[in-house]
């Protein structure tokens, strides 16, 4: 049986990246929360 986590930089960026976050309302809210908290890194 293969492991569930098969790392891929492209997939990672496309699902969790900044532009992916900005594309949806929920994603924008995530970024807003992280800005309010003062996170150094907002998205991947």
Curated annotation (Swiss-Prot):
Entry-linked Gene3D superfamilies: 1.10.287.3980
BP-aspect Gene Ontology terms: translation
InterPro entries assigned: Ribosomal_bL34, Ribosomal_bL34_CS
Membrane found in the keyword field: no
GO molecular function: structural constituent of ribosome
Similarity section: Belongs to the bacterial ribosomal protein bL34 family.
NCBIfam families listed in its UniProt record: rpmH_bact (TIGR01030)
Protein name listed in UniProt: Large ribosomal subunit protein bL34
């Amino acid at each position: 049986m293969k492991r569930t986590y098969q790392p891929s930089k492209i997939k990672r960026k496309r699902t969790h990246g900044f532009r992916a976050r900005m594309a949806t309302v929920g994603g924008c809210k995530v970024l807003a929360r992280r800005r309010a908290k003062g996170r150094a890194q907002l998205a991947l």
